[in-house]
Amino acid sequence: MPKCPKCGAEVKEPIKTWVLAPKGRKGVIIGLFRCPNGHYFRAKVGEAPPKKEAA
């Protein structure tokens, strides 16, 4: 569970997630979180599979 960098509160569920990956390489899944004190922050949620190139 990610912790808020400002207040240290643990947050369970992200508001939104997206894949951040360079071309042809393995990327990461980033999540946008909001702590109980109202601070927004981003954190790594998981690993993304490598993109498959079209032939």
Curated annotation (Swiss-Prot):
GO cellular component terms listed in the entry, alphabetical order: chromosome; cytoplasm
GO MF annotation list: double-stranded DNA binding
Subcellular locations according to the entry: Chromosome; Cytoplasm
Keywords: Chromosome, Cytoplasm, DNA-binding, Methylation
Superkingdom of origin organism: Archaea
Listed Pfam families: Cren7
UniProt PTM comment: Methylated at multiple sites, to varying extents.
Subunit and partners: Monomer.
Family: Belongs to the Cren7 family.
Role this protein plays: A chromatin protein, binds double-stranded DNA without sequence specificity. Constrains negative DNA supercoils.
Protein name per Swiss-Prot or TrEMBL: Chromatin protein Cren7
Species of the source: Ignicoccus hospitalis (strain KIN4/I / DSM 18386 / JCM 14125)
Gene behind this protein: creN7
